[in-house]
């Protein structure tokens, strides 16, 4: 007696397709300079949670007066005691602080909140990118730009835009030197207790 093969109404993805599918996790961003434009705090916080879950130390450098809301991050499961926050006065100081953190080799993820900074000089981008690659770390730049505004610089390997629609968050690749632009990821999030 022979066993019948099960037929699925859709093709089963191959192992190659499964491993090449983009994911929003630290392992996808290590060794890269990543920019998240326009409202990327949630996306950066997801990376902090992923890094901490995998035992990777993280640091957050902020050059703006408002940053993430610590109680929200703690409620999501982040260990705030293991997340050093460096407050600086300008984007240039923030980039130097990120450079020192990466050079130490102690951090798997460094988030640099640049705010409305128009860009970073090429030499600084090159140094940050090289340090991220050398120490197998991810450097995530948070900027406040529209999708049609230019990137922070040419060394940015991945540029993502965040779009919100109610409690749906869509991450869309505007630039990706590994996969090409255009791919997107969708995530459903819950709001604060008063909005649920």
What are these regions (language model features)?
Residues 25, 128-130, 161-162:
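A generic local secondary-structure boundary/capping motif
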Residues 48, 98-99, 129:
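Generic hydrophobic/aromatic pocket-lining and core-packing "Φ" positions
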Residues 55-56, 79-82, 107, 135-138, ...:
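Short glycine-/polar-rich loops that comprise or flank the Walker A/P-loop
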Residues 106-149:
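A contiguous pocket-lining binding segment that forms or flanks enzyme active sites
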């Amino acid at each position: 007696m022979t066993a019948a093969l099960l037929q699925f109404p859709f093709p089963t993805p191959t192992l190659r397709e499964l491993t090449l599918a983009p994911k929003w996790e630290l392992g996808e961003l290590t060794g890269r300079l990543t920019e998240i434009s326009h409202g990327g705090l949630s996306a950066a916080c997801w990376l902090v949670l992923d890094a901490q879950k995998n035992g990777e130390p993280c640091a957050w450098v902020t050059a703006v007066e408002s940053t993430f809301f610590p109680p929200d991050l703690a409620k999501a499961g982040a260990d705030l005691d293991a997340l050093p926050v460096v407050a600086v006065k300008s984007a240039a100081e923030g980039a130097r602080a990120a450079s020192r953190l990466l050079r130490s080799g102690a951090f798997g993820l460094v988030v640099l909140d640049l705010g409305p900074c128009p860009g970073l000089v090429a030499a600084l981008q090159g140094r940050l990118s090289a340090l991220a690659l050398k120490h197998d770390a991810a450097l995530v730049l948070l900027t406040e730009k529209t999708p049609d505004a230019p990137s922070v610089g040419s060394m940015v390997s991945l540029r993502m835009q965040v779009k919100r629609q109610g409690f749906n968050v869509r991450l869309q690749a505007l630039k990706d030197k590994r996969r090409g632009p255009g791919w997107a990821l969708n995530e459903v999030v819950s709001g604060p207790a008063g909005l649920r």
